[in-house]
Amino acid sequence: MSDINATRLPIWGIGCDPCVGDDVAALTTRGEA
C-alpha cells in the first residue's frame, strides 16, 4: 500500500510521512473515489 499512500500524498498535498497512516485510514473510512 506504500505506492497508494505515496500517490495520495501529492493529490491531497499533505506531504507529511507520519500522517500517511492516519490519512489513508480516513480516506478508507470516507470511501473516497
UniProtKB/Swiss-Prot annotation:
Processed by the macrocyclase-peptidase enzyme POPB to yield a toxic cyclic decapeptide. POPB first removes 10 residues from the N-terminus. Conformational trapping of the remaining peptide forces the enzyme to release this intermediate rather than proceed to macrocyclization. The enzyme rebinds the remaining peptide in a different conformation and catalyzes macrocyclization of the N-terminal 8 residues. Pfam families: Amanitin (PF24112). The keyword rRNA processing does not apply. Keywords: Thioether bond, Toxin. GO terms for molecular function: toxin activity. There is a cross-link at residues 11-18 (Cyclopeptide (Ile-Pro)). Residues 1-10, 19-33 form a propeptide. InterPro entries: Amanitin/phalloidin. There is a cross-link at residues 12-16 (2'-cysteinyl-6'-hydroxytryptophan sulfoxide (Trp-Cys)). Belongs to the MSDIN fungal toxin family. The typical symptoms of amatoxin poisoning are gastro-intestinal distress beginning 6-12 hours after ingestion, a remission phase lasting 12-24 hours, and progressive loss of liver function culminating in death within 3-5 days. One of the few effective treatments is liver transplantation. Toxin belonging to the bicyclic octapeptides amatoxins that acts by binding non-competitively to RNA polymerase II and greatly slowing the elongation of transcripts from target promoters. This is Beta-amanitin proprotein. It comes from Amanita rimosa.
